């Protein structure tokens, strides 16, 4: 993956400033990014439309003959709905992963980043192990975490979940990861993927 990752949060209609997005413009922008060497994209199952537009982009690349599927890395997320947390099961988890595979026209997901809305709700570890089972089935290459604090990340590591990354908000304004998270992650070979580094455009618009 690249050290600079192309975030796709704003592809979601809910997050787009204009209220809608011209997907053709987005795909053209993706092509320009790849031509400049920025080949890693970050999205999520809950970014409405983001996985679909990345899927169209993947098909465009395949059709061009200039790139192989492995030349592009797509990181997605598994974010179970809050009301599902108390009753989540393997069927639900596999269904979401299968949907992401279909949307993005991939044989396997490069990285699935697991987010759990409320650490007080039981089921987080069981769901993480379900992702491991899907990895063993070949549907997921790598498992990462999203917005896990140090304690939650430690639970994953201690339980043997093969965590390769954790995405966390980190900027000159929000330096919470420096307390314990960055050091713990580094000690265990876990990459930290920072988002919000420009504070949503407050620090710089470009």
Please tell me what each predicted stretch does.
Residues 101-123:
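Active-site groove signature of glycoside hydrolases
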Residues 19-33, 86-105, 149-155:
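Short, acidic/polar
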Residues 117-206:
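Beta/alpha (TIM)-barrel catalytic core signal, keyed to glycine-rich beta->alpha loops juxtaposed to Asp/Glu
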Residues 1-72, 136:
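N-terminal binding-site loop/beta-alpha segment at the start of enzyme catalytic domains
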Residues 6, 33, 41, 54, ...:
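Conserved, mostly hydrophobic/aromatic
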Residues 10-24, 78-94, 116-122:
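Active-site mouth loops of central-metabolism enzymes
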Residues 68-82, 112:
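A short, structured active-site edge motif that brings together acidic residues
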Residues 44-53, 81-86, 118-122, 171-176:
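Acidic-and-aromatic substrate-binding clefts and catalytic sites of carbohydrate-active enzymes
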């Amino acid at each position: 993956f690249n050290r600079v990752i192309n975030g796709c949060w704003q592809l979601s209609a809910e997050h787009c400033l204009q209220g809608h997005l011209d997907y053709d413009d987005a795909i053209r922008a993706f092509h320009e990014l790849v031509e400049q060497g920025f080949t890693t994209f970050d999205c999520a199952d809950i970014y409405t439309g983001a996985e679909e537009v990345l899927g169209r982009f993947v098909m465009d690349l395949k059709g061009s003959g200039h790139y192989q599927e492995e030349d592009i890395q797509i990181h997605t997320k598994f974010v179970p709905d809050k009301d599902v947390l108390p009753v989540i099961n393997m069927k639900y988890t596999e269904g979401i992963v299968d949907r992401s595979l279909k949307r993005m026209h991939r044989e396997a997901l490069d990285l699935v980043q697991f987010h759990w809305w409320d650490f007080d709700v039981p089921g987080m570890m069981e769901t993480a192990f379900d992702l491991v089972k899907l990895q063993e089935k070949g549907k997921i290459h790598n498992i990462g975490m999203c917005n896990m604090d140090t304690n939650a990340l430690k639970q994953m590591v201690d339980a043997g979940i093969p965590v390769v990354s954790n995405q966390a908000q980190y900027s000159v304004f929000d330096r919470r990861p420096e307390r314990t998270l960055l050091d713990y992650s580094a000690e265990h070979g876990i990459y930290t993927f920072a988002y919000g580094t420009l504070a949503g455009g407050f620090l710089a618009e470009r």
